[in-house]
Structure formats: C-alpha cells, structure tokens
C-alpha cells in the first residue's frame, strides 16, 4: 500500500485537483491496512478508477483510493474470466475478442475501468 499526502487527482477533463490522501492498493492482502488507515483518519473516502466521468473538486479533503488490480485470470475452458477492477474497459473488450470470448464487443470504446462499469451503467450502451 502506498500513501501520498496532498496528491494530484488525474482526470480525463484535466481539471486541476488534489486530495489530502491518495492511497494505492496493490492486492487484497492490503485491505486490512487500508481499513486501519481509513478508521484512524476519519475522513470521507472516494474510490477512483481512471478519472473518467468525474468532475473533481479543486481540493478533496479526504482519502482517494486507487486500486491497482491489473490482473486477468482465465479460470477454465468455458470462458469464465476473473478481471481486476483497474483493467481498462476497452482493453478488456479487445482482450476478450482476441481470445474468442464474445458477448460484449459492442461495448468497446467506453472509457473507464472494469471496477467502474456498474457505476457508469455500461450495460445501458445496448448490451
């Protein structure tokens, strides 16, 4: 887990923004440390993907959590895939098509990450 204080928030609109704490988590083993950190600080928390579809404030007096879960695991031969939340959505679509795993290729070119897909309501794009 990496913790940065007074860190810039990158976003697709290139709005200048920063936050009090920016925390990168690399794997699920760091969740306990993250929980302790959040509990001790008693600040609002926001989970950030790639910074698309957000309009950040000039300064966020809280904790930004940036998951760095960039893994793709093929679990068996019947097209079951486990995907990390930080994977870019369009990259995932291209990767699945390249592996002959079909079904959501019409959802290509949508900005954001896999973890943000439910919040961004990606399914509303026609699938």
Enumerate the predicted regions with their spans:
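Anion-binding (especially nucleotide phosphate/pyrophosphate-binding) glycine-rich loop
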Residues: 1-125
